[in-house]
Swiss-Prot record:
Co-factor(s): Zn(2+)
Organism encoding this protein: Shewanella sp. (strain W3-18-1)
Keyword Transport found: no
UniProt-annotated binding residues for Zn(2+): H12, H14, H197, D278
Key words, A-Z: Hydrolase, Metal-binding, Nucleotide metabolism, Zinc
Gene this chain is encoded by: add
Site (Important for catalytic activity): H221
Biological processes per GO annotation: adenosine catabolic process; hypoxanthine salvage; inosine biosynthetic process; nucleotide metabolic process; purine ribonucleoside monophosphate biosynthetic process
Enzyme class: hydrolase
Function: Catalyzes the hydrolytic deamination of adenosine and 2-deoxyadenosine.
Protein name listed in UniProt: Adenosine deaminase
Protein's UniProt keywords contain Mitochondrion: no
Length: 331
């Protein structure tokens, strides 16, 4: 099902959406933070999706617990380190870990630039102990408004040498992409690649805006592109990658069932599309789970799954030589 001759990658993976349950428990107790459960065993349902529960509100509540315990920069560094470990232990050859320093900082008023430094330090420490390639993507969380995103951007750009790209995430309907055109001009001027969450809560126009105005060469989720034939044609022609996260889309009620997921529609239209975990800690999944789902629920053949694996490597924010090195390591 997973072709071991092709690098296995996860390009849409939120570092702040992947905090271990035991880490939430330990950090909560270490810092005197009231948790919603009185044992490690009973904590899991408050921080992870259980069964077929699907609601954006419930999903976001669980996500909030993951950053609620980031009481100091050591906690941030620990979570970053464990993200590298989890990527390696799940069998990934390469992962792009994205994070919103404002979101991670806000509960305990941590310095935004300090959060970025702690993430970088934690990842570096993880890479010494685990054999996996990692790159970082900075997120601007649009839900907190333009001024907060400016603070976030400045903290991230201060460490741009440790980033490969910038992302825009959060409330797509309440804070449309055009509010952040100036922010992304600074991103482009800094020489970073751009991806954006778009076409998830809003329609295809949000994706057009992200591509044409923000400068996105990849789109996170993008499920609503299928209602715009001209956009689908554009995506295929210009090799704009779709970072698809089927289980997360189900958990957030972006789609009502796997059967309704548009993954197959993208593939049939020749759009470059990859499989990703999104918030693996909240969804309690790993990348292999997404490939199993793609086979059993999305009805992809083994040949199609291999193509999806290759797509991920092609879409990655890597140089050609780095891509070749990933393939060479699989021989």
């Amino acid at each position: 099902m997973i072709d071991t001759s092709i690098p296995l990658v996860d390009l849409h993976r939120h570092l702040d959406g992947n905090v271990r349950v035991n880490t939430i428990w330990e950090l909560g107790h270490q810092h005197g933070i009231a948790l919603p459960a009185d044992s490690l065993e009973t904590l899991a349902p408050f921080v992870q999706i259980q069964g077929k529960e699907t609601s954006l509100v419930a999903f976001l509540k669980k996500l909030d617990w993951m950053v609620a315990v980031l009481a100091d920069l050591d906690a941030v560094k620990r979570v970053a380190y464990e993200n590298v470990a989890d990527a390696a232990l799940s069998g990934l050859d390469y992962a792009e870990l994205r994070f919103s320093p404002y979101y991670m900082a806000m509960n305990h008023k941590l310095p935004i630039e300090g959060v970025v430094e702690a993430v970088v330090d934690g990842v570096k420490a993880g890479l010494k102990d685990y054999n996996v390639k990692i790159n970082l993507i900075g997120i601007m969380s649009r839900s907190f408004g333009q001024a907060a995103c400016t603070q976030e951007l400045e903290g991230l750009l201060a460490h741009k040498q440790h980033l490969v790209a910038m992302d825009l995430a959060g409330d797509e309907l309440g804070f449309p992409g055009e509010l952040f055109n100036d922010h992304f001009k600074r991103v482009r001027d800094a020489g970073l690649a751009i991806t954006a969450h778009a076409g998830e809560a809003a329609g295809s126009q949000s994706m057009w805006q992200a591509i044409q105005e923000l400068g996105a060469t990849r789109i996170g989720h993008g499920v609503n592109a299928i209602h715009d034939p001209r956009l689908m044609e554009y995506l295929a022609k210009h090799r704009i990658g779709i970072e698809s996260c089927p289980t997360s889309n189900l958990h957030t009620s972006t789609v009502v069932s796997y059967a309704e997921h548009p993954f197959r529609t993208f593939m049939d239209a020749g759009v470059l599309i990859s499989l990703n975990t999104d918030d693996p800690g909240v969804s309690a999944i790993d990348i292999k789970h997404e490939y199993r789902i793609a086979k059993s629920e999305l009805k992809l053949t083994d040949a199609e799954l291999a193509q999806v694996q290759r797509n991920g490597v092609e879409m990655a924010f890597l140089s050609d030589s780095e891509r070749k090195a990933l393939y060479a390591a699989k021989v």
